[in-house]
């Protein structure tokens, strides 16, 4: 919204303090969340500009590849769009088809800039290269649109979501398939998953020892405390041992 500085301050002033901020956004949203982390919590991932990686082969529909690519590119000029294939012929046809389809796209300026700045075509030569490339990219969205998806599916460990087969376009997951769409970007799928209920729960450790329990393990803990020259720790443990 075109608010001036004073209006923005008024909006923030009237907002209640929160303990956690979650949700996707562009590069500015992701940057803002990073700056407030520590004062509040954020989800354990980077939910920044959108990404798609498409795995295609000689039997993949050219139209499906191109439309999935521009469907991601039109999100944001910072969107990342990657095609991975072994098929040189598909690459040649894809480049031409992409150019044609971009001409009629209402958001063609955004999509064109996205593809120019962040688009990539990876020509690979074997399945090992495919698997390694995907796991290294760790895309937010992965479309596996090949004739035999089973040989890849269980070897992909780093991806926010995986759309399998020709009838599972990424764009559908934006709206109607029911899976969570707040997903890790910027390769953060290597260490995190999509937003889930677990992000809204905290865990508290509860420790309860019996007299017998503290006597059994206290000796070991005391040795460690004394080794670290933490006399107070050792005294605290000893005060509970052999106490009548």
What do these predicted regions represent?
Residues 13-14, 34-38, 57-61, 70-78, ...:
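Generic secondary-structure signature for well-ordered alpha-helical cores
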Residues 1-12:
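Single conserved hydrophobic/aromatic residue that forms the stacking wall/gate
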Residues 6, 20-24, 30-31, 42-46, ...:
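General beta-strand structural signal in soluble alpha/beta enzymes
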Residues 18, 79-84, 104-115, 145-146, ...:
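Flexible, glycine/charged-enriched surface loops at secondary-structure junctions
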Residues 135-244:
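C-terminal core of ALDH-fold dehydrogenases
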Residues 6, 15-19, 24, 40-42, ...:
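Short coil/turn connectors at secondary-structure junctions
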Residues 27-129:
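ALDH superfamily catalytic-core signature
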């Amino acid at each position: 919204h075109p608010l001036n500085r004073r209006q923005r301050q008024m909006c923030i002033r009237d907002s209640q303090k929160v303990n956690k901020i979650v949700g996707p956004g562009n590069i500015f949203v992701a940057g803002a969340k990073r700056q407030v982390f520590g004062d509040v919590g954020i989800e354990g991932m980077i939910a920044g500009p959108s990404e798609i990686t498409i795995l295609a082969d000689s039997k993949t529909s050219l139209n499906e590849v191109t439309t999935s690519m521009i469907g991601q590119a039109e999100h944001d000029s910072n969107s990342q769009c990657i095609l991975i294939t072994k098929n040189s012929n598909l690459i040649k046809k894809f480049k031409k088809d992409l150019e044609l389809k971009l001409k009629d796209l209402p958001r063609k300026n955004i999509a064109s800039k996205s593809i120019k700045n962040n688009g990539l075509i990876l020509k690979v030569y074997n399945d090992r290269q495919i698997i390694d490339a995907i796991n290294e990219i760790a895309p937010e969205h992965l479309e596996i649109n090949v004739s035999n998806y089973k040989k890849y599916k269980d070897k992909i460990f780093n991806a926010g979501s995986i759309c399998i087969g020709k009838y599972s376009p990424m764009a559908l997951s934006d709206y109607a398939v029911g899976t969570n769409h707040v997903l890790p970007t910027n390769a953060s799928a290597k260490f995190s998953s999509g937003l889930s209920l677990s992000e809204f729960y905290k865990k508290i450790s509860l420790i309860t020892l019996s007299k017998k329990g503290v006597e059994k393990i206290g000796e070991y803990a005391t040795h460690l405390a004394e080794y670290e020259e933490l006399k107070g720790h050792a005294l605290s443990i000893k005060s509970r041992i052999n106490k009548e």
